[in-house]
Amino acid sequence: MSKIPQHYPGKKRSAPRHVFIQQAKKKKQTNPAVYHGEDTIEEMDSTEAEQMDTEQATNQTAEAGGGGGGGGGGGGGGGGVGNSTGGFNNTTEFKVINNEVYITCHATRMVHINQADTDEYLIFNAGRTTDTKTHQQKLNLEFFVYDDFHQQVMTPWYIVDSNAWGVWMSPKDFQQMKTLCSEISLVTLEQEIDNVTIKTVTETNQGNASTKQFNNDLTASLQVALDTNNILPYTPAAPLGETLGFVPWRATKPTQYRYYHPCYIYNRYPNIQKVATETLTWDAVQDDYLSVDEQYFNFITIENNIPINILRTGDNFHTGLYEFNSKPCKLTLSYQSTRCLGLPPLCKPKTDTTHKVTSKENGADLIYIQGQDNTRLGHFWGEERGKKNAEMNRIRPYNIGYQYPEWIIPAGLQGSYFAGGPRQWSDTTKGAGTHSQHLQQNFSTRYIYDRNHGGDNEVDLLDGIPIHERSNYYSDNEIEQHTAKQPKLRTPPIHHSKIDSWEEEGWPAASGTHFEDEVIYLDYFNFSGEQELNFPHEVLDDAAQMKKLLNSYQPTVAQDNVGPVYPWGQIWDKKPHMDHKPSMNNNAPFVCKNNPPGQLFVKLTENLTDTFNYDENPDRIKTYGYFTWRGKLVLKGKLSQVTCWNPVKRELIGEPGVFTKDKYHKQIPNNKGNFEIGLQYGRSTIKYIY
C-alpha cells in the first residue's frame, strides 16, 4: 500500500545526525511481541527526514554513541542537550481505499512527573475504618455492600496510560469515524518519550519570605520500563479516569502504579449482640475480624522483572511497533428486539381512509384460520389446541440480549462486589396497568471525571440533577447554599470532590446495542389455576419478586460486545489467564488475543544528597521533570453502508445534554478557557441484525 500523504507538505531542512541514529536503533530492537514487518503506514513522526540505509546509520551509532540501550521491546536514544526530538502532532488522518477506511491517530502530550513520596514499595489495607463505640439498632447497608476495603501494593512508579478514546481523537474525529465506518479494527500502536527535562527545586527563606529556584539538572535521570510480555499485574487506568489527559494543549500527569495484593482476607462483619433488657431489641457494634493468609502473598516488583532504560535530559525512548490481534468492533445499532425477528403475521391493512404511520387508527386485521378460536398457522409456545396464538407466545429463533439477576452480590477474596451484566437501551420491566411503575433491570452506571478529562469548571452540577434526586448526591447544607445562590466554594479545590468532578449518568448505556422489549409479569403465565389478577398492585408485587427469573446468558442468546464510548471509554484490554476465556468485556470493545500493548512505566531516579542513610526516608534533592509523550494509533474500518431510504439522525439516542440547543455552546471554550467534552456513543449506525 502506498504511504499516506502528509497533511502539511513543505520544504524540510536536513535532519541532524542523531535522528538517523535513533532510527537505526528502532530497527535493531528484537522482541517476539513487537511487530517488525514492513511499515505500510508513514513513520510516526511526519517531520522526520527520509530514512538512511540501516548499515550506514549503525556505523554512525558506533561513532556517536547514544543513550540507554533497548529493553523490553523499546530502546533509548541520545538526542543531546539542546536538540529537540520529535514534534507535537494531534491530527487524525482518514484515507478511503475502495471499501476500507484507514485511520491514523497522532497524539502528543506534555507530561509532568514528580518524585513519589517514597521510593519503597508499600503494602497496606485501605478503605475501611472500625468504629467500636457507636451502638446502632439498625445496620447500615455500607457494612455489607458499599465496602471499600482492600489490600494494595503501591509502587514508586508511574504508569503512562493512553488507553482511552479521548487521548487519541477530538470530538469531531470520533464523530467522523463512527459516521464513516460500520466496523473498525485496531492495527498498530507506537509510543515514544521525547524532550526529557529534569529540574531540581531549591527553596530558601529570607525572613518571612520563601523563594524557590528551579535549575536544570543534566545528571538527573528518568527511568523508563516497558512491560512488553505483560508480566506485571494489568491495570488499565480508563475505568478510574486516570489516563493521560484529553486536551492536547493542557499538560497532564501519569497516575501512580499500584495493584491489588491478591492475598486472602477474611471478611469483616459487625458483631451483633442482644441488649440485656426485657424488650427484644438488638444492638450492633462494629467489631471487624481481619485475618490474612500468608500462603497467598504475591509481591511483584518492576526492577526484577523488566529491563529499565535510563534517560537524561535530551534523550528519547521508543516502544517499537505493536501489532494488534483482536476481533473487529461493530459501530452499528439495531432497533430490533426478540419480538421483531422473522416474518410478521399475515394481515389485511385497513383501507377505509388515509392514515399517517404515526396514527393509532392506521391499523390492520390479522388473518386467522377459519373456524378456529383466533388461531394462526405457525410455531407457538403452549399445548392447548384451538386457543389463541399471538405474537406474545410465538417461538422466536433467538433471544436478543439477556438480563442479569440484579442485586445478587457475591463475596470474593477481599470483600463483596457487583457482578453486573450488560445494559441495554431499554432495560426496564413494566407491570401491567395504568399506574404501573418501571422496575429497572441490570445495573445502571455512571462515570466520574475531572477537568483534564472533559470537565468544565463553569458547569453547575446540582442544576443538572432533578430536584427529587438531589438529596442522593448532596447534603442538605449544600442544597440550601445552592438555593440561596451563594457563590461556589472554589478554594482549596478538593481533588475528585463534588467541587472538582463531573458525573455522567447512564454510562456506558451504549454498550447495549439494541432495544429489548419491556417485560410484563403476569401470574397467569406461571401458576396454573389462577385466571385473573388485581391490577396493578398484584402485578407489581409479582414483578418485584420475579426480577431474578429473567432469561440469562445461554446458547440461544445473541449478544453484542460493548461499543466505543467517547471520551472516557477504554479501547483495548487483556484476556485473563484462565482455561475458559470470557466472550466479552464490560469496558473495552477490543480484547487482545495475544499479549496487549505493554504497560509503560516512568520514574525519576533517586537524586541523593551528601547525607546517606538506610532509612525508609533517605535525604533526597527535590526533583521533578516533564517530557513529551507521542503516540500513533492506526485503525482500519469498513465503509458504512446505510440501507434505508430515508435519512437517519444517527445521534438520536444516547447523546448527552451538552448537545441540546441551550447547552451546545459548552463544547467550545468560554472567556476563561473552560469547556465540556460531550459524551458520544460509538454504535450509532442503524442496521438490521436479522
From Swiss-Prot:
Pfam families: Parvo_coat. GO terms for molecular function: structural molecule activity. It comes from the Viruses. Capsid protein self-assembles to form an icosahedral capsid with a T=1 symmetry, about 25 nm in diameter, and consisting of 60 copies of two size variants of the capsid proteins, VP1 (10% abundance) and VP2 (90% abundance), which differ by the presence of an N-terminal extension in the minor protein VP1. Capsid proteins are responsible for the attachment to host cell receptors. This attachment induces virion internalization predominantly through clathrin-dependent endocytosis. VP1 binds DNA and may therefore play a role in viral DNA encapsidation. Belongs to the parvoviridae capsid protein family. Residues 40-53 have a biased composition (Acidic residues). This is Capsid protein VP1. It comes from Aleutian mink disease parvovirus (strain G). GO terms for biological process: clathrin-dependent endocytosis of virus by host cell; symbiont entry into host cell via permeabilization of host membrane; virion attachment to host cell. Residues 1-80 are annotated as: Disordered. One of its GO terms (cellular component) is T=1 icosahedral viral capsid. InterPro entries: Capsid/spike_ssDNA_virus (IPR016184), Parvovirus_coat (IPR001403), VP1/VP2 (IPR036952). It is found in: Virion; Host nucleus. SUPFAM superfamilies: ssDNA viruses. Residues 64-80 have a biased composition (Gly residues). Keywords: Capsid protein, Clathrin-mediated endocytosis of virus by host, Host nucleus, Host-virus interaction, T=1 icosahedral capsid protein, Viral attachment to host cell, Viral penetration into host cytoplasm, Viral penetration via permeabilization of host membrane, Virion, Virus endocytosis by host, Virus entry into host cell.
